[in-house]
């Protein structure tokens, strides 16, 4: 009986520790009450220095068999690389959960990758270029402080890059959090689990230079329906890891969703996007059914039909303008934003630690866990039910009390 109590207490103590660690021991932060839109005297154009001959197709999010089959993924890393090579992908990563695959580490186009997160609400991040896996995780539905704490830890390696994965899935990040959280470089706007266009505009409207990524998020390499559906197109002189991460951080690329009849070997491309005296000049390799310019708070700024070349004048009130391009066969291109700024140093402003709240919550958490351990010790030892501690009711002889007639 006592053994079973011990095992029960150990199990419950572990669960309670996870709760205390997540909701009381996690660092707490101060967040801006109002987001700041893009503004400044400079117009940043991520496509200012591109060469239309240097577009390379990339996929950074793919799962294979890992952790002895415990996670969702079929096929080996070698299978994944072989299939993406056959589809003319210049860069393709294996991003298993909390595991950096090194099968192709000797290749010139190898980029280290892993997906961080195994929590209930699918609040996941993709880490590219990291040398070690960050194991800090919060299992239960996460608070804003939990999410910021994880992003801070993932960003400690300044040579790596952090991407918010499928934010539209299960509301992994709320609208308010997208406005306030920092320390991520890109967003997986294009995913088979949802197009996070609204979420991207929330981030951009908060004045954060976060750039688009499109990925297959493939879990079964043998299923043709999961491969080659979405991609990131980067402008690269070479395909080594440093060049790939640099292009992603500068926004020198775009996301693409392939239509059902799209030839994967003949994709439409951006030829140029020039900015002169606030006027944007966009040229495509082929005619598009529609070209939409979208700005602050997701506002439609302008729309064009059946064109391959369009111009749009960027106003300061627009804050930013990004183009969404749709072709006749359903293929879509999502360009990165052109925006007003005062600097091209895109280091994000950190959310400062709220030291007072952090200390108070850690003290409360410590007291709660200490109280739990005291109760657990009492429970294991049977509480007050043992004979040695039982209160005995005294008895008195009959002569003690007078008789009443």
Where are these regions (language model features)?
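Short glycine/proline-enriched coil/turn segments at helix->beta-strand junctions
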Residues: 105-109, 158-159, 208, 287-289, ...
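C-terminal functional module detector
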Residues: 1-51, 221-405
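A metal-dependent hydrolase metal-coordination microenvironment
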Residues: 22-167, 172-174, 180-182, 188-203, ...
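Glycine-enriched alpha-helix->loop->beta-strand junction motifs that scaffold or abut catalytic
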Residues: 181-187, 207-211, 230-231
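Residue-level detector of solvent-exposed, low-hydrophobicity positions
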Residues: 68, 104, 191, 197, ...
């Amino acid at each position: 009986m006592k053994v079973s109590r011990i095992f029960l207490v150990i199990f419950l103590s572990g669960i309670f520790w996870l709760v205390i660690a997540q909701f009381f021991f996690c660092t707490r932060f101060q967040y801006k009450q109002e987001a700041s839109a893009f503004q400044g005297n400079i117009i940043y154009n991520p496509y200012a220095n591109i060469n239309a001959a240097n577009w390379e197709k990339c996929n950074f999010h793919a799962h294979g068999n890992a952790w002895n089959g415990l996670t969702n993924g079929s096929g080996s890393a070698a299978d994944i690389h072989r299939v993406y090579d056959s589809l003319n992908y210049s860069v393709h990563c294996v991003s298993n959960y909390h595991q950096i695959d090194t099968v192709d580490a000797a290749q010139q186009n190898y980029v280290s990758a892993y997906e961080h997160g195994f929590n209930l609400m699918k609040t996941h991040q993709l880490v590219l270029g990291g040398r070690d896996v960050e194991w800090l995780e919060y299992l239960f539905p996460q608070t804003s402080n939990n999410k910021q704490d994880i992003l801070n830890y993932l960003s400690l390696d300044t040579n790596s890059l952090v991407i918010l994965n499928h934010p539209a899935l299960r509301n992994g990040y709320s609208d308010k959090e997208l406005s306030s959280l920092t320390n991520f470089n890109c967003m997986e706007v294009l995913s088979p689990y949802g197009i996070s266009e609204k979420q991207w505009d929330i981030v951009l409207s908060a004045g954060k230079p976060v750039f688009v990524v499109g990925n297959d998020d493939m879990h079964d390499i043998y299923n043709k329906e999961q491969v080659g559906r979405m991609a990131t197109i980067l402008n690269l002189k070479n395909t080594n890891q440093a060049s790939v991460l640099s292009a992603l951080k500068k926004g020198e690329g775009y996301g693409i969703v392939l239509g059902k009849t799209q030839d994967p070997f003949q994709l439409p491309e951006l030829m140029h996007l020039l900015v002169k005296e606030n006027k944007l000049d966009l040229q495509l390799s082929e005619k598009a059914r529609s070209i939409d310019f979208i700005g602050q708070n997701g506002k439609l700024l302008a729309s064009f039909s059946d064109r391959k070349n369009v111009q749009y004048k960027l106003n300061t009130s627009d804050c930013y303008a990004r183009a969404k391009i749709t072709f006749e066969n359903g293929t879509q291109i999502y360009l990165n934003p052109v925006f007003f700024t005062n600097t091209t140093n895109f280091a994000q402003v950190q959310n400062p630690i709220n030291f007072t709240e952090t200390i108070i919550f850690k003290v409360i958490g410590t007291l709660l866990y200490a109280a739990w351990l005291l109760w657990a010790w009492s429970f294991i030892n049977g509480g007050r039910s043992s004979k040695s501690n039982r209160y005995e009711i005294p008895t008195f002889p009959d002569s003690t009390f007078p008789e009443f007639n």
